[in-house]
Amino acid sequence: MSIFNRPLLAATGSPCLISGLFAGLIVSQAVSVTAAAQTVDTLQADARTTEGGTGQTVPPAPADNAYPADYFALYVPRTALDMVRRIPGFQITRGDTGRRGLGQGGANILINGERLTGKTDPFDQLSQIQAESVVEIRIRDGATLSIPGLSGQVADVTVERTRALKGTWEWNPQFRRRLEPNLTNGELTLSGELGEAGGLTYALTLRDYGFRSGARATETLRNADGVLFETRDEDFQNGAPQPGAALNLGWTPRPDHKANLNAEYWQFNFSRSARAVRTPVTSAGDDTLTFSGRGEDEWNLEMDADYEFPVLSGTLKFIGVLDRESSPTFNSFSRTSPRTGFLGASRFDQEAEETEVIGRAEYGWSPSEGRDWQIAAEGAFNELDVEQQLFLRRPGGVLEGQGLSAFNVSEDRAEASLTHSRPLGPRLDLQASAGVEYSSLSQSRLTGPQTEAREFVRPKGFVSSTYKVDDSFDIRARLEREVGQLNFFDFVAAVDLEDNLNRTSNFDLVPSQSWLGSVEFDKDFGDGNTFRIEFYGAVISDTVDRIPVGTDGDAVGNIGKAHRYGFDIVSTIKGDRWGLPGTELNIEFDWRDSSVDDPLLGFPRRLNGDKEIAYDVEYRHDVTGTDWAYGGSVSRFISAERFRLFSIDRNGVDGPNSSLFVEHKDVAGLTLRATLFNVLGNEEFFERTRFDGRRDAGIVRQTEEIKYNFGPILSLSVEGSF
């Protein structure tokens, strides 16, 4: 439900565009005020009978958690993604993205009752389905399904395929102060069917999610007594074209046989440049000019496929995934004095190649109605190859290489699991899974001594249940044993040219293991009004955090046990019941705490950078009798400090993020939307405390604080279909 599900599209400040935005808001608000002056009875009658400019009535209340296509007509959706986002109280989760393998449930989206293939992004998959092809969307409970790992709310999108060629497109021009406009951000999707009915379906997407951004900032440096001794005025710009293409194929060669193939390729051509003037305050000396740059020419290829067919009294399914990523990057930094000239420069180059291959087989059968079994086996291979080189240039010298270093990190993994789903009564459903994982983790310095592989055997599994108190109130509980997914870059050393906060390699790193528990209460009050609260906790062993290595090394490693707990609230409030037709308020609020013993000083603290509080409140008004909609949002994310060997960092925003939007749903058949972000003019901040040695032995040397001023951001969007 959040309006921030897609990357923000930054834009700027044309006065006529901004005035047009607020003019639309004023007109829409005037219509709203006039409508609010009517009696409640009249408003309720309008909610049932009045047709808007789109010729659609206010959405009827869904029956039996099924949302027919006409429920969404008021919003004039273009894709299935637009429809799912308007389901009260529902949140899309990506599931396996960033998790270990394919056997942990996946995204909470089904298409015609089927799980998405491999690690397919549900946002991309839904955006490729035309809204007019959607028959209905039914909210189901994961514990009642025969899909291992799914729990909580699951959206099952029923799609009616068609042979006709259809397409959707969107264009998102971006404008922003002091930056060139970004005019190429957009997406085009073509879909249809070839051959006889039920034959080959296809969806082809071409897109560019490129962005440009920039800010000006002033950084202050103070000594241990709080005395300002240096200021730094910085101006930076960055951006990245992200062209890509995706192809999705579905094939039904004969009844009960299904095949899917998804392939996606995209580039990420990032560049960043920053110029700063460093001015001493308490000491004599010249200003220093610094220049830093970063670039990356990344390409990504993702492919996944599956084939499902009946065997004996059950169904056998094979799934394959291939991910490849190449990421050559560079970082540079130089210092110059206006009086004495060049002072020094450095450059750090890195070439990284990442590979993931997964194969999985699942066999499922149902011996009786409502009782499902599945046995699964999965194998995976992950690998990271990295080559790095540091270059230095001193006054009067040339750029000289400091030696090439190379690393390889790989993991072979196999797992097997047995999953069972069944009702335990007319109101209680249960799903349980037990499994075991074997993995072999190896790391090596290709330019130095080899490191032998380490082998692990770990249990995995979960128990998930749903108790249906009545037709509108569900209680869900889940207990899971999870093995974490490592970031292979954490094994590898890294160089920080600007701040001199380098990372040491650590080949002893192992995945964390966790016991996860949650209880969720989900209440539907009718007419689209929902409230859901989830309480959760985790006990983590082999916690991945920052650890000391040797006498002065700072690396990513394992620090023992940690605890994490919190609650999440998601609620939708529709205004129709209170005489405000077409209005809705969506609320998300998360609170979290965590505890781990600091590896240097032993005191309890939060996990590094862990979430503390996050909220997102979105208001929307689809004005009855018109094609206009308007609204806005406020949101914020507050995270904990990050502890390193010689420093403590914290970053965030000094107030809530804010936005206003106005939308017209039918301008010559197109949907036009203007959104003004950062209405309150917030600034991002970064704070750092540096010590003159390790935190356990040194004292505070200095504190640093910087604030980035981005200004207002205006985004335009034009959407159409054919």
Question: Where do the protein language model's features map onto the residues?
Answer:
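Outer-membrane beta-barrel signature, preferentially recognizing the C-terminal barrel domain
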Residues: 298, 352, 408-411, 454, ...
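Gram-negative outer-membrane beta-barrel transporters
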Residues: 536-539, 557-644
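Short acidic/polar hinge/loop motifs at secondary-structure boundaries
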Residues: 114-142, 188
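Transmembrane beta-barrel wall of Gram-negative outer-membrane proteins
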Residues: 178-215, 227-274, 294-311, 315-317, ...
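C-terminal beta-signal and adjacent terminal beta-strands/loops
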Residues: 38, 638, 662-722
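N-terminal periplasmic accessory domains that precede
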Residues: 80-83, 98, 150-173, 186
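Face-selective signature of the C-terminal outer-membrane beta-barrel domain
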Residues: 246-268, 292-446, 450-452, 458, ...
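A beta-strand signature from Gram-negative outer-membrane beta-barrel systems
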Residues: 131-166, 721
